[in-house]
From Swiss-Prot:
The gene is RR2. It is found in: Cytoplasm, Cytosol; Nucleus. Belongs to the ARR family. Type-A subfamily. It comes from the Eukaryota. This is Two-component response regulator ORR2.
Amino acid sequence: MGAEAVRVLVVDDSPVDRRVVELLLRAHCGGGGGAAAGEAAPFHVTAVDSGKKAMELLGRRRGDRDHLTPSSPAAAAAANDQAIDIVLTDYCMPEMTGYDLLKAIKALGSPNPIPVVVMSSENEPQRISRCLTAGAEDFILKPLKMNDVQRLRKCSGATRPKSAVAGDDDRCCNTAKKAAAAAAATPEQQQQQQRSSHLAGLAMVMNASSFEVSHYFQLIFKLILLAYAVLCLSQLLHRWSNGSSLLSLWCA
């Protein structure tokens, strides 16, 4: 029997980054890494472009669950469908940053707090430490890779057992060690890492959206052919009109 879907709320103001994350998570459906081989839970992705919209969505779903009758099996199923298992948010966003969203979610005071994972294209140790201290489950560098999806799956409240909670401290310690190692890196090394991340992100966009890109190229090519055909037709009409004028003068 397949595992239950992991409901992920993706928060990013960049439409390209949102699309990349959606494609990556959906491509990982049914992959390995679950409790048993071939039984990894698929991802159900909901994407918004701001922290404000994320809080509105979480508040609305929380309010809907509060109005349901707990004793009703149908109500329990509906509440389960509305739940969000994990929030994956970008750090740099206008108005409400990923750090602000993290604090706002933690301030909801839910008995079962939603795990929050922060992502960023900038490898800044102070930023990583700040988010982990505020309660982030993990901090992932963009662009996301397949092993990052595995980390996201382990952080989600829907798939990790209670016995795995004890391992959170070890995970956070490992992330903190990575942050310390990044702090020890020279500015040139950090710039090289950022350039590599940007190039990898571009490659991921091209690979994940190959169908969309090829479709756009075909459309552009057809438009160019159409424009060329119209140009040739106009030239022929122009020459024909000039020829008709000369013929009329010669006949006169």
